[in-house]
Amino acid sequence: MERKTWETHIIQKDLILFRKFIRNVKKDGQVCFDKPFTDKANIKKYLFTGYKKSYYPDNAFDSDSERLFSIILEEDPDVIKWIKPPLNQLGLFWQAGQQYNPDFLVETTTGKYMVEVKASNEIGLDEVIAKAREGIKWCRFASMADPDKKQWEYRLIADDNIHLGNSCKYTLGTARKISED
């Protein structure tokens, strides 16, 4: 018997609304986002506060590179808004019903971006590439439905390309090129 797979893309022209997220943090685990941070091995136990451009004023991160990228987003005058989407709320599936949660959705004065930050030694993994391809498809369909008529683009950025002081545009420009195939 031959197996077939179908892709279904439903374009909703409504806003994507995110619910509140819950994250367990250690006692005294709230840190102002732009202050020096040294406990990088335990970053998942902290909540970073004081964001102005983020959908949420407080954010949690899986890596220090994600935290550094959030600072770049906050400091760049071309960035209008950004969000670190809460787990399993975007509705983006990549394999057999598994959800893909990109690290960031970013709106700048010129475009919109889905951004994934990965360790440089993980950036070529099959799973990472497969998720990136689904992100590229999502961006293509989101561009068709975007009420602002801004193009959505996917960016896969290696952690060693994230440096404070660089602009968002420069950092996005370091992204690995992925084909949609």
Question: Where in this protein do the model-derived segments appear?
Answer:
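Active-site lining segments that contact anionic ligands and/or coordinate catalytic metals
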Residues: 101
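Intrinsically disordered, low-complexity, repeat-rich regions
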Residues: 1-98, 107-113, 118-181
